[in-house]
Amino acid sequence: MPQKDPCQKQACEIQKCLQANSYMESKCQAVIQELRKCCAQYPKGRSVVCSGFEKEEEENLTRKSASK
């Protein structure tokens, strides 16, 4: 049986917040930050819900090194 995603709760909170606020991301920054904190606690690849943040981070690093 697969393990439960350690950051699933925070991901669900983001969905609830977005639905409650007409998908205005700016109103959900606090819950988004909570998910980022959760993702930072686990090794890369451990949480499926964190994969978007991991990809974003990789792209930012690629852009920074390309601009040097």
Swiss-Prot record:
Organism: Homo sapiens (Human)
UniProt-recorded name of the protein: Cx9C motif-containing protein 4
Highest taxon of the lineage: Eukaryota
UniProt xrefs under Pfam families: CMC4
This protein's UniProt keywords: Chromosomal rearrangement, Disulfide bond, Mitochondrion, Proto-oncogene
Domain free text: The twin Cx9C motifs are involved in the recognition by the mitochondrial disulfide relay system.
Motif (Cx9C motif 2): 28-38
Annotated compartments: Mitochondrion
Positions occupied by motif Cx9C motif 1: 7-17
